[in-house]
Amino acid sequence: EPLPIDTLVAGLPSAFNDLSETGWFDAAQGILTTDTRAKGSSLQYGQDRPITITGIAKGSGMIKPNMATMLAYIATDAKIDNELLHRALRLACDKSFNRITVDSDTSTNDSVVLVATGASGVVIDEDTFESFVGHLTDIFIQLAQAIIRDGEGASKFVSVAIEGALDESEALQVAYTIAESP
Protein backbone atom coordinates (compact mmCIF):
# COMPACT_ATOMS: atom_id res chain seq x y z
CA GLU A 1 0.00 0.00 0.00
CA PRO A 2 1.48 3.39 -0.96
CA LEU A 3 2.33 5.83 1.81
CA PRO A 4 -0.45 8.46 2.02
CA ILE A 5 1.80 11.48 1.48
CA ASP A 6 -1.07 13.97 1.16
CA THR A 7 -2.49 12.88 4.51
CA LEU A 8 0.92 13.15 6.16
CA VAL A 9 1.61 16.60 4.73
CA ALA A 10 -1.85 17.82 5.74
CA GLY A 11 -1.18 16.75 9.34
CA LEU A 12 2.16 18.55 9.67
CA PRO A 13 0.83 21.97 10.79
CA SER A 14 -1.15 20.34 13.59
CA ALA A 15 1.85 18.22 14.60
CA PHE A 16 4.10 21.29 14.71
CA ASN A 17 1.56 23.19 16.82
CA ASP A 18 1.44 20.32 19.32
CA LEU A 19 5.21 20.27 19.91
CA SER A 20 6.29 20.99 23.47
CA GLU A 21 9.18 20.39 25.83
CA THR A 22 6.90 18.15 27.87
CA GLY A 23 5.59 16.07 24.97
CA TRP A 24 7.98 13.15 25.46
CA PHE A 25 5.29 10.79 26.77
CA ASP A 26 3.02 11.60 23.83
CA ALA A 27 5.92 10.90 21.48
CA ALA A 28 6.65 7.60 23.26
CA GLN A 29 3.00 6.60 22.83
CA GLY A 30 3.08 7.65 19.18
CA ILE A 31 5.90 5.30 18.16
CA LEU A 32 4.50 2.12 19.73
CA THR A 33 3.77 -0.86 17.49
CA THR A 34 3.53 -4.26 19.21
CA ASP A 35 4.78 -2.76 22.48
CA THR A 36 2.48 -2.98 25.49
CA ARG A 37 3.69 0.24 27.11
CA ALA A 38 5.59 3.44 26.43
CA LYS A 39 9.27 3.51 27.36
CA GLY A 40 11.05 6.63 28.54
CA SER A 41 13.68 7.87 30.92
CA SER A 42 15.10 11.24 31.94
CA LEU A 43 17.73 12.57 34.29
CA GLN A 44 19.45 15.78 35.25
CA TYR A 45 22.95 16.05 36.64
CA GLY A 46 25.19 18.89 37.71
CA GLN A 47 24.70 21.34 40.54
CA ASP A 48 24.92 24.93 39.33
CA ARG A 49 23.86 24.47 35.72
CA PRO A 50 22.26 21.05 35.27
CA ILE A 51 22.33 19.04 32.07
CA THR A 52 19.21 17.12 31.10
CA ILE A 53 19.18 13.88 29.13
CA THR A 54 15.80 12.46 28.09
CA GLY A 55 14.95 9.53 25.87
CA ILE A 56 12.15 7.36 24.57
CA ALA A 57 12.25 3.98 22.86
CA LYS A 58 10.08 1.34 21.26
CA GLY A 59 10.64 -2.29 20.59
CA SER A 60 9.55 -5.63 21.95
CA GLY A 61 10.67 -8.25 19.45
CA MET A 62 13.38 -8.90 16.86
CA ILE A 63 15.85 -7.06 19.09
CA LYS A 64 19.11 -8.93 18.49
CA PRO A 65 21.71 -8.29 17.22
CA ASN A 66 22.53 -4.66 17.61
CA MET A 67 19.10 -3.18 18.12
CA ALA A 68 17.06 -4.78 15.29
CA THR A 69 13.51 -3.31 15.14
CA MET A 70 13.88 -0.97 18.05
CA LEU A 71 13.83 2.79 17.83
CA ALA A 72 15.29 5.15 20.42
CA TYR A 73 15.33 8.94 20.47
CA ILE A 74 17.47 10.69 23.05
CA ALA A 75 18.07 14.42 23.48
CA THR A 76 20.28 16.45 25.75
CA ASP A 77 20.58 20.17 26.32
CA ALA A 78 24.36 19.85 26.69
CA LYS A 79 26.61 21.70 24.26
CA ILE A 80 28.91 19.12 22.67
CA ASP A 81 30.66 18.96 19.32
CA ASN A 82 29.63 16.33 16.77
CA GLU A 83 32.74 14.18 17.14
CA LEU A 84 32.36 13.85 20.91
CA LEU A 85 28.60 13.31 20.58
CA HIS A 86 29.13 10.50 18.06
CA ARG A 87 31.73 8.89 20.32
CA ALA A 88 29.35 9.16 23.30
CA LEU A 89 26.59 7.53 21.24
CA ARG A 90 28.82 4.58 20.28
CA LEU A 91 30.05 4.05 23.83
CA ALA A 92 26.56 4.20 25.35
CA CYS A 93 25.06 1.89 22.67
CA ASP A 94 27.81 -0.67 23.18
CA LYS A 95 26.89 -0.95 26.87
CA SER A 96 23.12 -0.99 26.37
CA PHE A 97 21.19 -1.46 23.13
CA ASN A 98 23.93 -3.57 21.55
CA ARG A 99 23.86 -5.95 24.51
CA ILE A 100 20.23 -7.07 24.54
CA THR A 101 18.24 -9.87 22.97
CA VAL A 102 14.57 -10.82 23.23
CA ASP A 103 14.04 -13.64 20.77
CA SER A 104 17.34 -13.93 18.85
CA ASP A 105 15.51 -12.81 15.69
CA THR A 106 17.03 -10.14 13.49
CA SER A 107 15.47 -7.34 11.52
CA THR A 108 16.42 -4.97 8.73
CA ASN A 109 15.90 -1.73 10.59
CA ASP A 110 17.00 -0.09 13.80
CA SER A 111 17.76 3.42 14.92
CA VAL A 112 19.15 5.31 17.84
CA VAL A 113 19.07 9.06 17.41
CA LEU A 114 20.97 11.31 19.80
CA VAL A 115 20.70 15.08 19.51
CA ALA A 116 22.30 17.84 21.54
CA THR A 117 20.59 21.22 21.52
CA GLY A 118 23.17 23.13 23.55
CA ALA A 119 20.29 24.94 25.30
CA SER A 120 21.80 24.53 28.78
CA GLY A 121 24.99 26.27 27.66
CA VAL A 122 27.01 23.65 29.56
CA VAL A 123 29.92 22.57 27.37
CA ILE A 124 31.00 18.93 27.27
CA ASP A 125 34.70 18.63 26.49
CA GLU A 126 37.35 15.98 27.08
CA ASP A 127 37.44 16.89 30.80
CA THR A 128 33.69 16.38 31.32
CA PHE A 129 33.16 13.71 28.65
CA GLU A 130 33.46 10.66 30.92
CA SER A 131 30.80 11.95 33.31
CA PHE A 132 28.49 12.80 30.41
CA VAL A 133 28.91 9.33 28.87
CA GLY A 134 28.21 7.72 32.24
CA HIS A 135 24.90 9.56 32.59
CA LEU A 136 24.02 8.99 28.93
CA THR A 137 24.73 5.28 29.34
CA ASP A 138 22.41 5.19 32.37
CA ILE A 139 19.55 6.47 30.20
CA PHE A 140 20.41 4.05 27.39
CA ILE A 141 20.48 1.10 29.83
CA GLN A 142 17.13 2.08 31.33
CA LEU A 143 15.58 2.24 27.86
CA ALA A 144 17.20 -1.02 26.73
CA GLN A 145 16.01 -2.81 29.85
CA ALA A 146 12.50 -1.43 29.37
CA ILE A 147 12.50 -3.00 25.90
CA ILE A 148 13.51 -6.36 27.38
CA ARG A 149 10.85 -6.15 30.08
CA ASP A 150 8.26 -5.57 27.33
CA GLY A 151 9.64 -8.35 25.12
CA GLU A 152 7.13 -10.23 22.97
CA GLY A 153 6.29 -13.40 24.86
CA ALA A 154 8.84 -12.64 27.57
CA SER A 155 8.05 -13.73 31.10
CA LYS A 156 11.51 -13.22 32.61
CA PHE A 157 14.27 -10.61 32.67
CA VAL A 158 17.71 -12.22 32.78
CA SER A 159 21.14 -10.59 33.00
CA VAL A 160 24.17 -12.67 32.06
CA ALA A 161 27.60 -11.80 33.51
CA ILE A 162 30.69 -13.53 32.16
CA GLU A 163 33.96 -13.72 34.10
CA GLY A 164 37.29 -15.14 32.97
CA ALA A 165 36.86 -14.57 29.23
CA LEU A 166 39.96 -13.84 27.18
CA ASP A 167 38.44 -10.64 25.83
CA GLU A 168 35.15 -8.80 25.35
CA SER A 169 34.39 -10.60 22.09
CA GLU A 170 34.67 -14.01 23.74
CA ALA A 171 32.57 -12.84 26.70
CA LEU A 172 29.82 -11.63 24.35
CA GLN A 173 29.83 -14.90 22.43
CA VAL A 174 29.42 -16.89 25.65
CA ALA A 175 26.78 -14.50 27.00
CA TYR A 176 24.65 -14.66 23.85
CA THR A 177 24.98 -18.45 23.72
CA ILE A 178 23.54 -18.59 27.22
CA ALA A 179 20.90 -15.89 26.66
CA GLU A 180 19.63 -17.46 23.45
CA SER A 181 19.57 -21.06 24.64
CA PRO A 182 16.12 -22.67 24.70
PLM regions and their residue ranges:
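Generic structural hydrophobic/aromatic packing signal, biased to beta-strands
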Residues: 31, 44, 74, 114-115, ...
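Acidic, glycine-rich loop-and-beta core segments that form the ion-binding/anion-interacting portion
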Residues: 81-143
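Glycine-rich, mobile lid/loop segments that gate access to catalytic sites or pores
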Residues: 1-97, 107
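Structured core elements
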Residues: 52-55, 73, 101, 113-114, ...
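A glycine- and small/hydrophobic-rich beta-loop-beta segment
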Residues: 117-182
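Flexible, glycine/charged-enriched surface loops at secondary-structure junctions
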Residues: 21-28, 97-109, 142-159
